[in-house]
Amino acid sequence: MTENIIESGDPQARYDSVIEKDSKYVMQTYGRQPLVLSKGKGAVVQDIYGKEYIDCVAGIAVNNVGHCHPTVVKAIQAQAENLIHVSNLYYTEIQAEFAETLASITGMERVFFCNSGAESVEAAMKLARVATGKSAFVAAEHSFHGRTIGALSVTHKSMYRDPFMPPVSSETTFVPYSDAEAIRQAISENTAAVILEPIQGEGGINIPDPGYLKEVREICDETGALLIFDEVQTGFGRTGTWFCKEQFGVEPDIMSMSKAIGGGFPMGAIAAHNGINFGRGQHASTFGGGPLACAAALASVKVIREEKLLERSKEMGAYFMKKLAGMVRDDVVEVRGKGLMIGVEIKYPCGKFVDFAREQGVLVNCTSDSVLRLVPPLVITKEQIDTVVDVLEQA
């Protein structure tokens, strides 16, 4: 971004005004970085002072096609001129078109639209219960599936769960991640589903052992429990395929999606196979599958296809991990990931890396205390990756 995109007015005064208003009016639930961002393009964002940052957070793995991709922007603008919202009491052409598109890229027959990742997990849990007539769940330790009450029932981290106990589902059993036998032992006659992230995101970019998910699939088939994959963070090219399930050759019964689905526009969805359906009136969403969201999502899918971002995610991810592994540091435990979903485990809390990188014009964040999460837009360049690695090597 070479153009001057700073709004008029003194930047310091504008910064102070934002911080003051946020402190006064917004519930202070977020541990924010001391940045007020104003614009973004591709893999770069700009703050109100005009400083640019290579963005390896990407709205938390949302901006896969890059910030403000012109195809997505134009699609939203065009749709906004015709129809913004009508609710699901009526049909719209664009929702039907995106439903067909989503069924095609997921390889699943039925979809339901919502607005966020947590909503998609809630919908998946409800669907599992209604499809099986059972109520219990098996989930993994270090899992993260959302902060709404239902999703918290299958989210492991006590910091998120404990203030809101008891959970909606008190019948959730947590087992070690990547331990299929533990899942077998945990499934009961009342288990509706096993819910897993194919790669754990918030838990530390944890990749399961080879064969783990296939074995879980076999166990679910044997016991009659459904298998839910939470692909909220791993979907839409993040790991180098449309969905991470393709990396492991395993097909879930239900899949939750959000984050990158709308190219930065809020949207969520679940997909399921025939025979696993809600009945009329069993679930609903006022805004789910709205015209603007579907326009953005169709545009996002188009960009991923036309710009070959699945292949680019693999290529840039391999390049990024090779460069990271070559850093001259003695405090890096491991570099791991798939595609452009990368974790760098450090021997100690990684907060200082986040602060140093920000000061040097790179945005990263920690997932778990000691793992740096790098999830840049899939359009990131090798030159930008080189800059990021140079900064992290100096931290």
Curated annotation (Swiss-Prot):
Gene3D superfamilies: Aspartate Aminotransferase, domain 1, Type I PLP-dependent aspartate aminotransferase-like (Major domain). Binds 1 pyridoxal phosphate per subunit. The modification N6-(pyridoxal phosphate)lysine is found at residue 259. Its cofactor is pyridoxal 5'-phosphate. Pathway: Amino-acid biosynthesis; L-arginine biosynthesis; N(2)-acetyl-L-ornithine from L-glutamate: step 4/4. It is found in: Cytoplasm. One of its GO terms (cellular component) is cytoplasm. Its EC number is 2.6.1.11. May also have succinyldiaminopimelate aminotransferase activity, thus carrying out the corresponding step in lysine biosynthesis. This is Acetylornithine aminotransferase. The lineage of its organism: Archaea, Methanobacteriati, Methanobacteriota, Stenosarchaea group, Methanomicrobia. The gene is argD.
